[in-house]
Amino acid sequence: YLAKSGFDAVYPWHMFKMMEKIAKGERPAFGLDSINKENETRYPKNTIQMYFTSNHDENSWNHADFGTFPNEVHAPFAVFTQTMKNSVPLIYSGQEEPVLRAIKFFDKDPMEFKNLQRENFYKTLLNLRKRNIALSANASFKKVQVGDEKVIYAYTREKENKKILVILNLSENEQVIKITDKNLIGKAHNVFNEKETILDTKERKIKPWGYEVYEY
């Protein structure tokens, strides 16, 4: 309704709820695809969606993200919110610390910032969004199979001469991945370790709740 009424962005609640179920092991990673297809018919073309792992409702009433995406579970889903098509990411109050409690919904509830444990993580993602046109809302999105799609979710974003590859392990177990798409083989920049690397067709492992992002 909001998108059809002229709003530029909407909350993709169905996607958030699917993310929660995947984090709990209740649904496979490819459950995200069903929501993507649903949203293509739910919203007008190119509707921007505000992806999130926590917001004021979910934090206060349902203990997001410290309860719904606890500890290392948070990271791959946060990467997803920052790199999906038609997305504008939401970082809720205190997530960069992180503040591991429910913030009062109606009353003043000051937060204390000391460690900023996720500062570099979020800064890396936000800088990537700022500099790379492949993460524009209208950049292309393509699923890529690099492993067991019940637990591995991988995709590319591309616009003009820029391309990004995202690989997410949405499970509590180490997984084996292998890149077979010839368009993804070769020199790439690892966004998180800031090193140039050569991606090849060899099998390798990705840690539980692991995430990899590459620029081409």
Please state what every model-predicted region is.
Residues D57-N59, E96-L100, E160, L170-N173, ...:
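Short, solvent-exposed loop/turn segments at secondary-structure junctions
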Residues Y1-Q49, N71, P98-L128, I133, ...:
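Active-site-proximal helices and loops of the catalytic beta/alpha 8
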Residues V88-S93, I133-A139:
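Acidic/polar loop patches that form or flank catalytic/metal-binding clefts of enzymes
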Residues K37-T41, A78-Q82, L90, D148-E160:
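Short, surface-exposed beta-strand/loop micro-motifs that present aromatic residues
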Residues L199-Y216:
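C-terminal beta-strand-rich structural cap/linker in extracellular carbohydrate-active enzymes
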Residues V144-D181:
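Carbohydrate-binding surface patches
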